[in-house]
Amino acid sequence: MVQYPMTANGAAKLRSELKQLKTVTRPRIVKAIAEAREHGDLKENAEYHAAREQQGFCEGRIQDIEAKLSNARIIDITNITNNGKVIFGATVTIVNVETDAEVTYKIVGDDEANIKINLISVSSPLARGLIGKTLDDEISIVTPGGTIDYEIISVQYIA
């Protein structure tokens, strides 16, 4: 069985969502289905069909989260020997060599990635280029727009 890396924070968020789905969302949907059934003919009952569709999405998400958590390898970055290298969970500040544009990313699991808040997937091309590198190393990342050269100016290990 393949295990997928995940930060402790990412696992906690998934557990919280799972609890919400099981204790709040699922019972609300079951109640909505019961109420819709009371309205009679189910063939043309839009409320019933909408509630059943919600139930399908909810149950699918529950199964998805449970599978992710059961296959997750929770990595606590504070317990890893890093020797100053970029590793999973590291917060890395890089600067574009050409433009001097500076950006900070945290390398996280696939399910935690959110580029809007600078969380990049460990399997992304940028993260793959950063893993194993150290402070002041330069990397070249091939993008659809061409190759971009970056220099690592900071590596932090923040939980």
UniProtKB/Swiss-Prot annotation:
| GO molecular function terms attached to this record | DNA binding; RNA polymerase binding
Which Gene Ontology BP annotations are present? DNA-templated transcription elongation; regulation of DNA-templated transcription elongation
Q: Where is the signal peptide?
A: none
Identify the InterPro entries for this entry: GreA/GreB_C_sf, TF_GreA/GreB_CS, Tscrpt_elong_fac_GreA, Tscrpt_elong_fac_GreA/B, Tscrpt_elong_fac_GreA/B_C, Tscrpt_elong_fac_GreA/B_fam, Tscrpt_elong_fac_GreA/B_N, Tscrpt_elong_fac_GreA/B_N_sf
Q: Name one Pfam family in it.
A: GreA_GreB
Question: DNA-binding: present as a keyword of the record?
Answer: yes
Print the keywords alphabetically.
DNA-binding, Transcription, Transcription regulation
Q: What does this protein do?
A: Necessary for efficient RNA polymerase transcription elongation past template-encoded arresting sites. The arresting sites in DNA have the property of trapping a certain fraction of elongating RNA polymerases that pass through, resulting in locked ternary complexes. Cleavage of the nascent transcript by cleavage factors such as GreA or GreB allows the resumption of elongation from the new 3'terminus. GreA releases sequences of 2 to 3 nucleotides.
Q: Sorted alphabetically, which PANTHER family does this protein's record hold?
A: TRANSCRIPTION ELONGATION FACTOR GREA
Against HAMAP family, the record matches this protein to: GreA_GreB
Which family is annotated?
A: Belongs to the GreA/GreB family.
Q: What is this protein called?
A: Transcription elongation factor GreA
Q: Which organism is it from?
A: Psychromonas ingrahamii (strain DSM 17664 / CCUG 51855 / 37)
Gene symbol here is greA
